[in-house]
């Protein structure tokens, strides 16, 4: 809906949003949806310069995912690892809400170059709106994986036994 209050709700959501993107043409419309984007919307840079970073649009996707989950919904979203320690107002509001409301279940910091074609270090946040645990499992998988080349790109991939270790840690709530 245009006001952001009547979103379709889902049992499960998995999202891989763009991290940086400009949307100056629709910024005002998006920013007006305060129920949907309760932590805020990133500001438009004063002068859009192709050499400078674009807007942190992933913060909008993160809020959208949380608002689109049913009360018993579960979800996962890929985010830049820097989100967890960000001092930015919007990121801090989102992090505070998902921890205080006990929405976030866990976070895995992934190895660099493991994901798509981005050089950005990424983490995966897991949500479970049906649980109300006081604990969030944090897994540092940033040193795992093996290097390989794909064309001219140096990449990293998790091996099956490492994936099993991560799954086991989540199931047993061990970091």
What are these regions (language model features)?
Residues 3-175:
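A conserved structural/catalytic subdomain of Rossmann-like adenosyl-cofactor enzymes
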């Amino acid at each position: 809906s245009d006001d952001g209050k009547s979103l379709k709700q889902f049992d499960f959501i998995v999202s891989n949003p763009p991290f940086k993107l400009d949307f100056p043409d629709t910024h005002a419309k998006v920013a007006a949806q305060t129920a949907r984007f309760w932590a805020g919307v990133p500001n438009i840079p004063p002068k859009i310069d192709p050499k400078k970073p674009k807007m942190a649009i992933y913060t909008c996707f993160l809020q959208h995912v949380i608002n689109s989950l049913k009360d018993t919904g579960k979800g996962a979203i890929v985010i830049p690892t820097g989100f967890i320690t960000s001092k930015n107002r919007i990121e801090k509001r989102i992090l505070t809400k998902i921890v205080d409301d006990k929405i976030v279940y866990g976070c895995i910091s992934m190895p660099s170059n493991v994901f798509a074609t981005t050089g950005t270090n990424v983490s995966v946040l897991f949500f479970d709106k049906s649980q109300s645990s006081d604990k969030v499992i944090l897994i540092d998988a940033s040193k795992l994986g093996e290097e390989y080349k794909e064309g001219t790109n140096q990449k990293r991939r998790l091996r099956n036994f490492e994936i099993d270790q991560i799954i086991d840690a989540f199931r047993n709530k061990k970091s």
